Amino acid sequence: MTTREYDYIICGAGSAGNVLATRLTEDPDVTVLLLEAGGPDYRFDFRTQMPAALAYPLQGRRYNWAYETDPEPHMDNRRMECGRGKGLGGSSLINGMCYIRGNALDYDNWSTHKGLENWTYLDCLPYFKKAETRDVGPNDYHGGNGPVSVTTSKPGVNPLFEAMVDAGVQAGYPRTDDLNGYQQEGFGPMDRTVTPKGRRASTARGYLDQAKVRPNLEIVTHALADRILFDGKRASGVTYLRGSERATAHARREVLVCSGAIASPQLLQRSGVGPGAWLKELDIPVVLDLPGVGQNLQDHLEMYIQYECKEPVSLYPALKWWNQPKIGLEWMLNGTGLGASNHFEAGGFIRTRDDDLWPNIQYHFLPVAINYNGSNAIEMHGFQAHVGSMRSPSRGRVKLRSRDPNDHPSILFNYMAEALDWREFRDAIRATREIMRQPALDRYRGRELNPGADCKSDKELDAFVRARAETAFHPSCSCKMGYDDMAVVDEEGRVHGLEGLRVVDASIMPIITTGNLNAPTIMIAEKIADKIRGRKALARVDVPYFVANGAMARNIAKAVRQPETV
């Protein structure tokens, strides 16, 4: 057994851990050990580096923990996929590369919780900007010199993108030129974490590439954190496994848990921090009975509403093996072409009811009919909308199964447990059909493939959701930030009741944000990094942002009405 000592030990080199490792080692006198259970982010592996290949990492276990849920009681008892990234970059190494920050009111809502007053949107915006380099340059809402490369959608990529945005506007919803700017609500182009050379912009590329040469940062891959060590109520180190070898590292200052919304509560529970009754079931000595560890688990569900495409403009030919070498060669040599995009270049956010305070439904538009993980491709030209609700009231949990760090925990999201879930999904399907009926899509829209035109009643729509809805891969909130009885960490990520221990990742969100989670997770880590370093928080940015204030969710007067038979 080997033993080393560092100022900070970070468990997990993902979207948050790499940010902390990079920012903390900007101070040359600070030493950091970064532990990652997966391997390197191999730059010659097209599966993780080519944006268009985003489905491939989810199909194996080299880069994916490939968790499964317990049977979900409201989803036909399906065991549902729960992919999480494994390797330098974490889930930013295998995600869909959609750069969505969330709605301003997400953060303003967080700030209404006791003790979280400094998490308003205007407090968070400087850290979004700090992390970002946007290809069209900085402005009041965007950064121009950060580690994360953000690419904007360019005109003429595929006519279906513009047609689907136009259809949303024709249906009476707003148009927005920037889903991360003044107004998230509406339809428009989608920003993506892709470099100017057409490569995935993971946090390993953006952050670790600048930090890994520093002598005060040690990165250890294939290192699975087993337990956090404690001296009384103070975290003092970590034991971890590299193959059959066990090692121990001691932390002079803090242990920083950045393992994600599944593995962070798992590591805490295995270390004796969590619901006391759960720990006693496995004979784990209780360091602190903290009931919220693993509770409050949230995610986004989504469906694929799919249509036949009457014109040969979809990505269907690119799915054929004989066309892929040319696509791959252009991407490899020039960083251009179909391989250089994740093809989520347009989308949007809407409110389905006028009394919704901010958008409750998200859209990703895709010019092909296929599942996110590459399965169930429709053998024809097609297109689809990924659509799902944003802030489900349903809550789940992550619970340890055993003391073995190699065993996956018991995961139950408890999807669709509340009546509001069902109402929002029915509303979403009907709103999507209304959008797809608009004149902008007349030349492209063929028959509805899924759910199918005959699926109309509430009962039929509910059956489709139970059988076909899937995760959007956004687990979060399982070690929530706050000060109520179920809160795990304070506003700086410090675990309540303990010293020298923080959690910094998507698990500390009190409520899931409106959209994809990679950008918010990076922001959270940037913000808390300043707290750890004892630096003054970046000044609030005083910019306006859209608030509906009871405005109509959809302008019916401007909508183009189309018969339902179209």
Curated annotation (Swiss-Prot):
<dbReference type="GO" id="GO:0008802">
    <property type="term" value="F:betaine-aldehyde dehydrogenase (NAD+) activity"/>
</dbReference>
<feature type="binding site">
    <location>
        <begin position="7"/>
        <end position="36"/>
    </location>
    <ligand>
        <name>FAD</name>
    </ligand>
</feature>
<dbReference type="InterPro" id="IPR007867">
    <property type="entry name" value="GMC_OxRtase_C"/>
</dbReference>
<dbReference type="Pfam" id="PF05199">
    <property type="entry name" value="GMC_oxred_C"/>
</dbReference>
<keyword id="KW-0560">Oxidoreductase</keyword>
<keyword id="KW-0520">NAD</keyword>
<comment type="similarity">
    <text>Belongs to the GMC oxidoreductase family.</text>
</comment>
<dbReference type="InterPro" id="IPR000172">
    <property type="entry name" value="GMC_OxRdtase_N"/>
</dbReference>
<dbReference type="Pfam" id="PF00732">
    <property type="entry name" value="GMC_oxred_N"/>
</dbReference>
<keyword id="KW-0285">Flavoprotein</keyword>
<comment type="function">
    <text>Involved in the biosynthesis of the osmoprotectant glycine betaine. Catalyzes the oxidation of choline to betaine aldehyde and betaine aldehyde to glycine betaine at the same rate.</text>
</comment>
<dbReference type="InterPro" id="IPR036188">
    <property type="entry name" value="FAD/NAD-bd_sf"/>
</dbReference>
<protein>
    <recommendedName>
        <fullName>Oxygen-dependent choline dehydrogenase</fullName>
        <ecNumber>1.1.99.1</ecNumber>
        <ecNumber>1.2.1.8</ecNumber>
    </recommendedName>
</protein>
<dbReference type="InterPro" id="IPR012132">
    <property type="entry name" value="GMC_OxRdtase"/>
</dbReference>
<feature type="active site" description="Proton acceptor">
    <location>
        <position position="474"/>
    </location>
</feature>
<comment type="pathway">
    <text>Amine and polyamine biosynthesis; betaine biosynthesis via choline pathway; betaine aldehyde from choline (cytochrome c reductase route): step 1/1.</text>
</comment>
<feature type="region of interest" description="Disordered">
    <location>
        <begin position="180"/>
        <end position="202"/>
    </location>
</feature>
<dbReference type="GO" id="GO:0019285">
    <property type="term" value="P:glycine betaine biosynthetic process from choline"/>
</dbReference>
<dbReference type="GO" id="GO:0016020">
    <property type="term" value="C:membrane"/>
</dbReference>
<keyword id="KW-0274">FAD</keyword>
<dbReference type="GO" id="GO:0008812">
    <property type="term" value="F:choline dehydrogenase activity"/>
</dbReference>
<dbReference type="GO" id="GO:0050660">
    <property type="term" value="F:flavin adenine dinucleotide binding"/>
</dbReference>
<dbReference type="InterPro" id="IPR011533">
    <property type="entry name" value="BetA"/>
</dbReference>
